[in-house]
Amino acid sequence: MDKRAMLGAIGLAFGLMAWPFGASAKEKSMVWNEQWKTPSFVSGSLLKGEDAPEELVYRYLDQEKNTFQLGGQARERLSLIGKQTDELGHTVMRFEQRYRGIPVYGAVLVAHVNDGELSSLSGTLIPNLDKRTLKTEAAISIQQAEMIAKQDVADAVTKERPAAEEGKPTRLVIYPDGETPRLAYEVNVRFLTPVPGNWIYMIDAADGKVLNKWNQMDEAKPGGGQPVAGTSTVGVGRGVLGDQKYINTTYSSYYGYYYLQDNTRGSGIFTYDGRNRTVLPGSLWADGDNQFFASYDAAAVDAHYYAGVVYDYYKNVHGRLSYDGSNAAIRSTVHYGRGYNNAFWNGSQMVYGDGDGQTFLPFSGGIDVVGHELTHAVTDYTAGLVYQNESGAINEAMSDIFGTLVEFYANRNPDWEIGEDIYTPGIAGDALRSMSDPAKYGDPDHYSKRYTGTQDNGGVHTNSGIINKAAYLLSQGGVHYGVSVTGIGRDKMGKIFYRALVYYLTPTSNFSQLRAACVQAAADLYGSTSQEVNSVKQAFNAVGVY
């Protein structure tokens, strides 16, 4: 099995080119999109005023219409889809580009306003749509588009017609197909058998051609398995690696059982028994004496305990309440399928296979694996990075970074390897990936060595090594390809990448935009002339990302 295909989750790549103008945070710095010849990241003192924050954005874009090339008034081209205040007091807004009322796929703009000053814009907008002759009425129906997608899944993926589950509603979008935007249907095909899949299809609304497709594993829909009413208790059990853990449970006097239901964190943490089937979520895990020492219990003990650790990490370190920021319940299913060699976040819950005992142990036994997958959930609710090409590699890297930081937070034999606790149990020192030395497992550690093929959604598990190495260097320091990097420690590195993920990245961000986002995040947190900003630049220089 290709270990790069493990730990899957959700990528158009928009080529970017950086053009900094001045060193001060108050002077403009731009990252240009090479494909569309428009800015994809602008920071500095962009515009001041007493208008509402969104009005500043519209005014600035109208003022710079020759640069952004939106055509017409900005308020007619952008729809405000999100607005919040971050921990620094900045007003952060997300806008979606529209063409005659139809959303432009992946074209999201993030704007920051602080004390009446527009300080940054991040995201790729598609220019000059008004100059193109774009159809806004489909020649094929929704039903036809869905049938085309399902048939392609059967022909190319499952080799049989999958038992499709309810997915995201099919919708019309303007899809940036290369340099030729066109009207398309976005179709979601979800299924659990014969293998789990959550495919996104772009179907040309004119002729039914498949324009693009990718497997976005983190968006399936579970059902059943209700919480129980009862008293919060503390149980004890043994995990996959044989270590003892105390876990929060719930005793139901009505049923006379203790359940893996933790009522102390957010809306609860629930762990289910899949019973080696592929129906989610399974049965809420029950035990007669609140002691979970049977070998069959081990995967559930770890899934339950580590979900709590991940919740605590995001709450205590980043002030984030669960993966959605609003204390959503965390649900996990263990013993999924038979010998299933994977784990995944499906948009609503965690799913863990038992492994085959040779390539993998039960996946919930790796705390970095649990942190990795739940971070995909955080990404889903923030940047929404498309799981393909460079945006998908950033998605994977974010999960590796925060999975590793969770492991250090819990101080459970922490290191910079990914999946080392559950991968190839018969081979000492083996792992899925390495952040400190990506080349150790065949992954690139420099942009010049990136994978440019189409396998693995454009190398999402491979090219993540480039960003992993940058994060490692930012934390620990070192010399890489002749570039010296001053380390700033894990905590600051995590703060910078978290802020970049939550407040600057957009669905189609690529590596250059990630660099700009991390530089801006470091400037926000530590000052524009700080060592932290310099170290971010050094780390990305060292891996060839500019």
UniProtKB/Swiss-Prot annotation:
Its cofactor is Ca(2+); Zn(2+). One of its GO terms (cellular component) is extracellular region. One of its GO terms (molecular function) is metal ion binding. InterPro entries: FTP_domain, PepSY, Peptidase_M4, Peptidase_M4/M1_CTD_sf, Peptidase_M4_C_domain, Peptidase_M4_domain, Zinc_Metalloprotease_M4. Residues 26-228 form a propeptide. GO terms for biological process: proteolysis. Ca(2+) 1 binds at D287, D289, Q291. Thermostable. Zn(2+) binds at H372, H376, E396. Its main location: secreted. Ca(2+) 4 binds at Y423, T424, I427, D430. Residues 1-25 form the signal peptide. It catalyses: Preferential cleavage: Xaa-|-Leu > Xaa-|-Phe. Keywords: Calcium, Hydrolase, Metal-binding, Metalloprotease, Protease, Secreted, Signal, Zinc, Zymogen. Gene3D superfamilies: 3.10.170.10, 3.10.450.40, 3.10.450.490, Neutral Protease Domain 2 (1.10.390.10). The active site is at E373, H461 (proton donor). Extracellular zinc metalloprotease. Belongs to the peptidase M4 family. This is Thermolysin. It comes from Bacillus caldolyticus. The lineage of its organism: Bacteria, Bacillati, Bacillota, Bacilli, Bacillales.
